[in-house]
Amino acid sequence: MNILQYTFFQNALLGAFLTSILCGIIGTYIVTRRLVFISGGITHASFGGIGIGVFTGTNPILAAMIFAILSGFGVQWMSSRKDVRKDSAIAMFWTLGMSVGIICCFLTPGFMPDLPSFLFGSILTIEGSDLWLLGILTCITIAVFTFFLHPIQSVAFDSTFARSQHLPVAAIEYLMMTLIAMTIVASLKMVGIVLAISLLTIPQMTANLFTYNYKQMIFASIILGWIDCIIGLYASYVLNVPSGATIIFVSIMVFMLSKTIKALQNKLYNKDKLSLEKK
């Protein structure tokens, strides 16, 4: 394809590949640990950091990452207290980030051309610095999961049991909250704040239809995410529509197709089982 000759499209493919690895690993923990709502709260809270970055003239991604990590820590700390419900803590930081972001953007003079890309994403605008961020974060995440897979997996499935085994549950939860926040912010250029949480959940949901094994879910999520990105990028180029939204739409279609296939498999299996029992 002629489109592959362009540097911006090559960057988009590389960015999609790195993001698929990153979201495949972190997203599996999110889905297994049932942290989708918390991750959604952190995603929207990161807008506060973007607003502060735009207002102060600093790097919006760096500001968003710091704000997202602090928000994640805040949710984790407040939800561990008996006098605050987890969903209430999430809602508070969710709205805090959005309100701070809106106020800062309103107070910033002049036109802000990068703001729509943070809200809705544009993978075709990924630059070298974005690829470096994704690459470094991907390497860090792979290293963390390579050396600490067993305790992370234990906390993901049953934190109470992990605590009874004298594992550092609190430290692991804060470590994972940091990686979740950094992954969300690093993915903003891909699909934006509005759709970022989808990259961390939909491929994992699709993988979970066919396996419950943690490692298999990670690898399947990476492959599915990469396929979704390639198809979405090509479709957005052909149809001349936003790439981020197209990638998410494709991932949802893949999930629905997989769900249908799985349902048909179960139906055929039950039918064959019933016929064998009659014999």
Question: Could you describe each region identified by the protein language model?
Answer:
Residues 194-245:
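Transmembrane alpha-helical segments in multi-pass inner-membrane proteins
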Residues 13-18, 61-66, 91-92, 131-136, ...:
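Hydrophobic alpha-helical transmembrane segments
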Residues 28-111, 207-219, 236-239, 263-264:
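Short loop segments and helix-boundary regions at transmembrane helix junctions
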Residues 6-11, 82, 90-150:
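Transmembrane helix-bundle core of multi-pass membrane transporters
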Residues 241-248, 252-279:
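Cytosolic-side transmembrane-helix boundaries in multi-pass membrane proteins
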Residues 130-202:
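Helix-loop-helix "hairpin" substructures at the membrane interface of multi-pass membrane proteins
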Residues 15-24, 45, 49, 53, ...:
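Alpha-helical transmembrane segments in multi-pass membrane proteins
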Residues 1-21:
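Membrane-interfacial amphipathic/re-entrant helices at transmembrane-helix boundaries
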